[in-house]
């Protein structure tokens, strides 16, 4: 009798551990932002859409408005090169943007919505003085049954400044563009140890200028994960993905098969990681057949007053340079939010890329891209805060930009 009870308790423990991992996947247990935004102009950091999916948002409605002033030393370099090489010049600017977040739900359904937008005015920009931007983020999870979880993630942004956190877009200033990433997935627990996750992701990139039109494309990714709970804190994963990339006009269409394996592991209640490795087999109009190793990892550490997210990947990426074919690239990103004191907090967003035809030219060319943005926020009152920071970008040593800013934010 005792042995039977112990066996039942062990079975329940394994089942609970497995269900907790599923909850973490749909973002129901850890508080945090749905996505990160740039404090100087309110534009979203696209890479945070996936990394922040483990977070949940406080229920209710939150509104905020920010007014920022700053100086950008290379605002007029439309070609993306440095000030000295292309005649680009600096400009004082001011930004005014607002954001709204709303979270609601039931025990079976959870919905989080965040949206925002604003305008940046450059005093010394000859033609385009006003620079509008806006974004929308939506996260929805629904459990039709105890075994099944349906998830939907929607992200779309309209902006003109390049977003170097992902490879969906140029690393040069090519005018206003729309970037969208939408994912729907179905997770089903067949047994207490075995589950599957079926997903579809649509990525869309559309520039409104003729200079950026060769980057316009749609990316369709179909995925199937087979998950097995090896231990209460570790799940083994076998994964297959099929990707179709369809360019609007450039002859760079491709199809790719991904054969991957990896682990999802909880090191401690505060530290968890995901790891994938394997091979990608690509057939493209420009390069023919390519076989390349693939690696992807993400570590999330929940601090007492914040969090750290570190991501890494090595894969074949679409080029950031107009009209240039794809090539392997290494990409790493670090996001840090930390409360230094009761009133003072610090943020850091760091992204680095090596390879991927960033410097243009032939398919073998490569370069280094770095994007770093530290900032501080000081809570003056419960609703009013001051922020200041610095944003630096450099692409292949030929393009650099320094952005200094400070402002006030009011939430209600």
Which stretches of residues belong to each language-model region?
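Cleavable N-terminal export/targeting peptides
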Residues: 1-40
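Gram-negative and organellar
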Residues: 24-412
């Amino acid at each position: 009798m005792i042995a039977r009870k112990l066996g039942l308790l062990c079975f329940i423990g394994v089942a609970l551990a497995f269900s907790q991992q599923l909850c973490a996947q749909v973002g129901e247990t850890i508080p945090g932002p749905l996505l990160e935004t740039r404090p100087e102009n309110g534009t979203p950091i696209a890479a945070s859409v996936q990394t922040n999916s483990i977070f949940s948002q406080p229920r209710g409605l939150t509104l905020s408005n920010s007014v920022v002033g700053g100086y950008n030393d290379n605002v007029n370099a439309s070609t993306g090169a440095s000030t000295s090489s292309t005649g680009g010049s600096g400009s004082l600017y001011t930004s005014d943007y607002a954001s709204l977040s709303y979270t609601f739900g039931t025990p079976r359904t959870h919905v989080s919505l965040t949206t925002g937008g604003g305008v940046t005015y450059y005093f010394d920009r000859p033609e385009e003085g006003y620079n509008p931007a806006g974004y929308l983020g939506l996260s929805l999870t629904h459990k039709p049954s105890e075994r099944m979880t349906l998830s939907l993630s929607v992200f779309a942004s309209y902006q003109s400044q390049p977003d170097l956190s992902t490879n969906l877009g140029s690393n040069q200033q090519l005018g206003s563009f729309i970037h969208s990433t939408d994912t729907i997935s179905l997770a089903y627990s067949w047994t207490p140890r075995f589950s599957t996750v079926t997903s579809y992701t649509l990525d869309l990139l559309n520039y409104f200028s003729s200079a950026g039109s060769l980057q316009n494309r749609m990316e369709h990714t179909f995925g199937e994960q087979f998950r097995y709970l090896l231990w209460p804190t570790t799940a083994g994963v076998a994964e297959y993905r099929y990707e179709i990339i369809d360019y609007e006009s450039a002859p760079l269409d491709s199809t790719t098969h991904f054969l991957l394996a990896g682990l999802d592991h909880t090191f401690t209640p505060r530290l968890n990681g995901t790891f994938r490795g394997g091979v990608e087999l690509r057939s493209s109009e420009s390069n023919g057949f390519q076989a390349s190793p693939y690696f992807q990892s993400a570590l999330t550490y929940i601090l007492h007053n914040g969090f750290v997210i570190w991501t890494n990947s090595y894969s074949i990426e679409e080029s950031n340079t107009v009209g240039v074919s794809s090539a392997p690239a290494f990409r790493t990103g670090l996001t840090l939010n930390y409360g230094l004191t009761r009133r003072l907090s610090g943020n850091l967003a760091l992204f680095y890329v090596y390879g991927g035809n960033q410097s243009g030219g032939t398919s073998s060319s490569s370069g280094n891209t770095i994007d770093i943005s530290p900032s501080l926020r000081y809570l003056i009152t419960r609703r009013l805060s001051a922020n200041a920071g610095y944003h630096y970008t450099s692409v292949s040593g030929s393009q650099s930009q320094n952005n200094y800013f400070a402002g006030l934010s009011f939430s209600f």
